[in-house]
Amino acid sequence: MTLLGTALRPAATRVMLLGAGELGKEVAIECQRLGIEVIAVDRYPDAPAMHVAHRSHVINMLDGEALRHVITEEKPHYIVPEIEAIATDTLRELEGEGLNVVPCARATQLTMNREGIRRLAAEELGLPTSTYRFADSEASFHDAVAAVGFPCIVKPVMSSSGKGQSFIHSAEQLAQAWEYAQQGGRAGAGRVIVEGVVKFDFEITLLTVSAVDGVHFCAPVGHRQQDGDYRESWQPQQMSELALKRAQEIARHVVLALGGHGLFGVELFVCGDEVIFSEVSPRPHDTGMVTLISQDLSEFALHVRAFLGMPVGAIRQYGPAASAVILPQLTSQNVTFDNVHAAVGAGVQVRLFGKPEIDGSRRLGVALATGENVEEAVIRAKKAASRVTVKG
């Protein structure tokens, strides 16, 4: 049985978000709907989830001492990481002292970098993955590329949104790719993964919920990537029954091995009936923002329900839907959005994240749309996103 207190009262149930971006903002809103007290933590002030939290803190979350201090001060009942760049050793210590880390500290630590989760998936669970090697020096990087072969992809073991990633076709690109990877890691320069290129028909995110009433799957989410970050996503992605069954088997193995309750974004490559594991995030996934319009329970609502210990039951998918990012390029600390009225309409919504500034290219919002089919939904979402004019 789940007992929930009332926010700002002595018996309040407190949730602390470690990372307060647009995904954390939606988690905070779902917590608010249940009267939960929300504390948002990030490395910069006025982050999106801070706008809808009861309190907020600005710290370097890779600083274990600072992280322990804010957790000790706030005494949250649930610690909910939204990003990878966190002092996970401290989270494991705190979990050992009785605190509840979502989904669990081990999952957060293993998925903090690509090495932990790749070794779990390929070497412990025996799941199909791309060929790979790890390297922690430029010399070992050259050896890794030689072993994997061209073409290949290099990524920092800890990065997101395509930062530090390069697609390598020839030896002439190696020096530049190594340097770019060293600049793009979340925790600074360091170890990289070199991956062989997988031939696939499409990529999916299989949003997988581990809850008290078992493992549940959302309909597969298809998506298009550009420069290492998603541009559009849609649901459901059409695939064969056999491929879907294999995808669900892989996702089930991964989330049960990681442990804990919550929603996981399991990324997979699909080629015909074959499915290859790519990555997993033990939290809501950016491509899953489409579920804000496509399901009765969004990925954020499912995450909260699961980590609070509530049953999920069934997940209802309404039909073809899509999301398209609003991704302007400018420099401003006073961003405004014009022409939003022309973007919204029947079956079309816009979410603006409220990020405090932009310096270059940054995802500031998302358009959501339904359609008679996925193709129509994608067109409607892209058209809506393009109509929003961002100024600064």
UniProtKB/Swiss-Prot annotation:
Stretches assigned to the ATP-grasp domain: 119-308
Name this protein carries in UniProt: Formate-dependent phosphoribosylglycinamide formyltransferase
Cross-referenced PROSITE patterns: ATP_GRASP (PS50975)
Enzyme class (EC, first level): ligase
Keyword set includes Manganese: no
Function noted in UniProt: Involved in the de novo purine biosynthesis. Catalyzes the transfer of formate to 5-phospho-ribosyl-glycinamide (GAR), producing 5-phospho-ribosyl-N-formylglycinamide (FGAR). Formate is provided by PurU via hydrolysis of 10-formyl-tetrahydrofolate.
Catalyzed chemical reaction(s): N(1)-(5-phospho-beta-D-ribosyl)glycinamide + formate + ATP = N(2)-formyl-N(1)-(5-phospho-beta-D-ribosyl)glycinamide + ADP + phosphate + H(+)
Binding site for ATP: R114, K155, S160, S161, G162, K163, G164, Q165, E195, G196, V197, V198, E203
Gene: purT
Assembly and binders: Homodimer.
Alphabetical UniProt keywords: ATP-binding, Ligase, Magnesium, Metal-binding, Nucleotide-binding, Purine biosynthesis
Family: Belongs to the PurK/PurT family.
GO biological process: 'de novo' IMP biosynthetic process
Superkingdom field: Bacteria
Pfam families, per database record: ATP-grasp (PF02222), PurT_C (PF21244), RS_preATP-grasp-like (PF22660)
Pathway: Purine metabolism; IMP biosynthesis via de novo pathway; N(2)-formyl-N(1)-(5-phospho-D-ribosyl)glycinamide from N(1)-(5-phospho-D-ribosyl)glycinamide (formate route): step 1/1
EC number: 6.3.1.21
Residues binding Mg(2+): E267, E279
Residues where N(1)-(5-phospho-beta-D-ribosyl)glycinamide binds: E22, L23, E82, D286, K355, R362, R363
NCBIfam families, sorted: PRK09288.1, purT
Keyword Phosphoprotein: no
GO molecular function: ATP binding; magnesium ion binding; phosphoribosylglycinamide formyltransferase 2 activity; phosphoribosylglycinamide formyltransferase activity
Annotated GO CC locations: cytosol
PANTHER family: FORMATE-DEPENDENT PHOSPHORIBOSYLGLYCINAMIDE FORMYLTRANSFERASE
